[in-house]
Curated annotation (Swiss-Prot):
The protein's name: L-lactate dehydrogenase 2
Protein source organism: Enterococcus faecalis (strain ATCC 700802 / V583)
Function of the molecule: Catalyzes the conversion of lactate to pyruvate.
Biological processes per GO annotation: glycolytic process; lactate metabolic process
Keyword list, A-Z: Allosteric enzyme, Cytoplasm, NAD, Oxidoreductase, Phosphoprotein
Active site annotation, chain numbering: H178 (proton acceptor)
Length: 317
């Protein structure tokens, strides 16, 4: 079994990168955190600020500002760098500029001799995870996007608030694109041990009419946040930290990450958000949900949209 030193590098020290670092320190996930940014003074300042709180955390974490060469012996490199989503802009609108940024970053990481696991948190995450995989030359199992982890926790939050229960007792997934074409899998959503479709219309808290409203609210949460504060970062910070924790601790946890499909769900050669088993080898298995007809159709549309965007990035497209 692979033994980790629990050394993690984070590329990009904007709101998302520092939120990931902050979440990891508070949870004692890593032993060493390296912050890498084109603005070295910024990464140095963030490292100093984060270190000031380490003594109140669960573990003693060494946090410092480095460069790409320091990724050489990292267990995980988390990539957050890229252009930010602006009000009125979809995640897919970012694709051209961020694809080029991603290629440059990954090339710099791989030049260091890095041979660990890449976790991608830049948007549009499904497309950029594919770009990172191609640029890295790593096995598909060791290139993981944050996928629909954030969408899934938003989904569980909405249901928990409506039903007045702990969100940790809501079991359900958002799959597909992390974005406008994402799919809520109602057919496999459980409240405790009870299917949610058996609960619908038995309580005034949740009716059939509420289901599409909830799906849309989950889908549009990012836009709502961006309209109010220009960026989202705490939720994705905690979601990314959860993925890193599963890898470093070899949890074999089922998480809705952006993983490579090679025949699963009837799809080929695409990264998208689906439940997958995550441990110290990266993604070791894809969990295939038995989707109903409507969910299959929506998932197909979501994947098709991602493939169209990928095709637009090809030189001769």
């Amino acid at each position: 079994m692979k033994v980790f030193n629990k050394k993690v590098a984070i590329i990009g020290t904007g709101f998302v990168g520092t939120s990931i670092a902050y979440s990891m320190i508070n949870q004692g996930i890593a032993n060493e955190l390296i912050l890498v940014d084109i603005d070295k003074a910024k990464s140095e300042g963030e490292a100093i600020d984060l270190l000031d709180g380490v003594s109140w955390g669960q573990e003693n974490v060494n946090v410092w500002a480095g460069d790409y060469q320091d990724c050489q012996d990292a267990d995980i490199v988390v990539i957050t760098a890229g252009a930010n989503q602006k009000p009125g802009q979809s995640r897919l609108d970012l694709v051209s500029i961020n694809a080029e940024i991603m290629k440059t970053i990954v090339n710099n990481i791989m030049k260091s001799g890095f041979d660990g696991i890449l976790v991608i948190a830049s948007n549009p995450v499904d497309v950029l995870t594919y770009v990172a995989w191609q640029a890295s030359g790593l096995p598909v199992s060791r290139v993981i996007g944050t996928g629909t982890t954030l969408d899934t926790t938003r989904f569980r939050k909405e249901l928990s608030q409506r039903l007045a229960i702990d969100p940790r007792n809501v079991h359900g997934y958002i799959i597909g694109e992390h974005g406008d074409s994402e799919v809520a899998v109602w057919s496999h959503t459980m409240i405790g041990t009870k299917p949610i479709l058996e609960i619908v219309d038995t309580t005034e808290r949740l009716t059939s009419d509420d289901l599409p409203i909830i799906s849309d609210k989950v889908k549009n949460t990012a836009y709502e946040i961006i309209d109010r504060k220009q960026a989202t970062y705490y939720g994705i910070g905690m979601s990314t930290a959860r993925i890193v924790k599963a890898i470093l601790n070899n949890e074999q946890a089922i998480l809705p990450v952006s993983a490579y499909l090679d025949g699963q769900y009837g799809q080929q050669d695409v990264f998208t958000g689906i439940p997958a088993v995550v441990g110290n080898q990266g993604v070791t298995d894809i969990i295939e949900l038995n989707l109903n007809a409507a969910e299959k159709e929506l998932f197909q549309k979501s994947v098709t949209q991602l493939k169209q965007v990928m095709a637009s990035l090809q030189p001769n497209a």
